[in-house]
Regions:
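N-terminal prepro-regions of secreted/extracellular proteins
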Residues: 1-44
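Post-signal peptide N-terminal regions of Sec-secreted extracellular proteins
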Residues: 31-147
Length: 147
């Protein structure tokens, strides 16, 4: 299981509770989960696609990378805004049938992936994560990107 506790978020929440009178904390005040290239040194970051909850709140990102050396795209799904999901999954595919996934039967809480496919053309990516409370389930995708 991949897990990194967010002590800053815990400290902020504790401070708010101790201050009294404030009953809600928005995710916008929490620090973003950093994007880290776990695909490898030959991969270059291309772009990110949001993973949103049913209420439209962005709860994660799917980061897409490219390696010109191997002609492969790589995807990683990660939470944002200091949130910690119960699970994370990521998938990547090509129009020609290339496919890879990670986290579908796991309980990752920091990130899912890296997953990569040989893709001299376009790829599609899908990411999802499960939360308790108000966020429930989040998903996001991007079709025919990095062409």
């Amino acid at each position: 299981m991949r897990f990194a506790p967010n002590r800053l978020l815990t400290s902020v929440a504790l401070a708010v509770v101790m201050a009294g009178g404030v009953t809600t904390v928005t995710t916008a005040t929490a620090s973003a989960t950093p994007r880290v290239n776990v695909c490898g040194s030959s991969y270059t970051y291309l772009e990110s696609f949001p993973i949103r909850s049913g209420t439209g709140t962005t709860v994660g990102d799917i980061d897409l990378y490219w390696s010109a050396q191997s002609e492969r795209n790589c995807a990683v799904a990660r939470p944002v805004n200091g949130l910690t999901p119960h699970w994370i999954a990521v998938e990547i595919s090509t129009p020609s049938g290339g496919y890879a996934s990670d986290g579908l039967s796991e309980n990752y809480t920091q990130y899912a992936g890296p997953v990569s496919v040989y893709a001299p053309g376009c790829v599609s990516v899908f990411g999802s994560m499960g939360y308790g409370g108000p966020y429930g389930y989040g998903q996001g995708d991007a079709n025919n990107v990095a062409c």
